[in-house]
Amino acid sequence: MSWQEKINAALDARRAADALRRRYPVAQGAGRWLVADDRHYLNFSSNDYLGLSHHPQIIRAWKLSAEQFGVGSGGSGHVSGYSVAHQALEEELAEWLGYSRALLFISGFAANQAVITAMMAKEDRIVADRLSHASLLEAASLSPSPLRRFAHNDVTHLARLLASPCPGQQLVVTEGVFSMDGDSAPLEEIQQVTQQHDGWLMVDDAHGTGVIGEQGRGSCWLQKVKPELLVVTFGKGFGVSGAAVLCSNTVADYLLQFARHLIYSTSMPPAQAQALRASLAVIRSDEGDARREKLAALITRFRAGVQDLPFTLADSWSAIQPLIVGDNSRALQLAEKLRQQGCWVTAIRPPTVPAGTARLRLTLTAAHEMQDIDRLLEVLHDNG
């Protein structure tokens, strides 16, 4: 089989399964409205959960800082790319979340890959929730450590896996809020079991940080858990992009030596770091509280109105509200019908989710209004 034949076969298999991914160029993809082909759609696909991507205070911070620092960092943080703006953001994040240190990364994917790659050796073991994000599972699969997966949120299964002999260290990996199901991990129970077996806990709280908990401190703060490694991202609740790893002083020093994704990547622009500082200020303020309260009210309204639809509604009180359709073709058809009626919704299919669980991944944001939720419910009932 030639290279071209190999590529064609893989693409043909995806097409045959109605699983071929496509991108749509949009004029605006975050906020209340998605704009594509000169048409405005109510946007139920964005991860901009607090509606901060268009916040004037954050935009102003980026503009002013771009004039001060320029539009790029100029290099890796280990060379010339670590600015006073990066340092200030790291210190503010660490203070906010109760850690000694924070290290910035250009993306959540890079942060997860960097930590697992740097921390794990062949004598160690990774024990991950089966539904953990692709960045976590890929890093675990590529690391020299054996990977064991426990059934989703099943602490008993986790305990059994941790109890089996391991010559090295054990790292338990999970998410705070799961990206495709919107449900939360039982972090307190997971941490207790992990500590009983002298393991460390790593939590990716991409979808909880900024959105839940006191001052938006996220899933771990809400459940009174402090994992040894906490990954937060800035493309969801913060409305920007990037990520950070929260940890102890010694772990931060270790990652600065051995985390190749950090060492060999150009740092985020200093102006972006300043915009993230502005975003953090909003998240921690009374305005942030008001946005979280509004989002919670929108979620309650949606869940109350969707109960009688012939789809499975995931057990989620987060901004992620998946409607599980099952069949790939049916999910694609339903997403297209909703778009035709002015609601932009994304169909998520295998391999992103397990086979037979194709779904509409609906996301609600504080930028929405109650009438937007009512319109979504109306369209769903028309096509249910």
Curated annotation (Swiss-Prot):
Which reaction(s) does the protein catalyse, per the Swiss-Prot or TrEMBL entry?
6-carboxyhexanoyl-[ACP] + L-alanine + H(+) = (8S)-8-amino-7-oxononanoate + holo-[ACP] + CO2
Q: Where does pyridoxal 5'-phosphate bind?
A: G108, F109, S179, H207, T233
Pathway it works in: Cofactor biosynthesis; biotin biosynthesis
| Organism for this UniProt entry | Escherichia coli (strain SMS-3-5 / SECEC)
- PROSITE patterns given for it? AA_TRANSFER_CLASS_2
UniProt keyword annotation of Secreted present: no
Cited InterPro entries: Aminotrans_II_pyridoxalP_BS, Aminotransferase_I/II_large, AON_synthase_class-II, AONS_Archaea/Proteobacteria, AONS_Proteobacteria, PyrdxlP-dep_Trfase, PyrdxlP-dep_Trfase_major, PyrdxlP-dep_Trfase_small
Q: Which residues bind substrate?
A: R21, H133, T352
Concerning Gene3D superfamilies, the annotation shows:
Aspartate Aminotransferase, domain 1, Type I PLP-dependent aspartate aminotransferase-like (Major domain)
Descriptive protein name: 8-amino-7-oxononanoate synthase
Residues recorded with modification N6-(pyridoxal phosphate)lysine: K236
The EC category is transferase
Please list the GO biological process terms of this entry.
biotin biosynthetic process
Q: RNA-binding among the record's keywords?
A: no
Q: What functional role does this protein have? A: Catalyzes the decarboxylative condensation of pimeloyl-[acyl-carrier protein] and L-alanine to produce 8-amino-7-oxononanoate (AON), [acyl-carrier protein], and carbon dioxide.
Q: Which UniProt keywords apply?
A: Biotin biosynthesis, Pyridoxal phosphate, Transferase
Q: Which cofactor does it need?
A: pyridoxal 5'-phosphate
Family per record: Belongs to the class-II pyridoxal-phosphate-dependent aminotransferase family. BioF subfamily.
Molecular function per GO: 8-amino-7-oxononanoate synthase activity; pyridoxal phosphate binding
EC id: 2.3.1.47
Q: Assembly state and interactors? A: Homodimer.
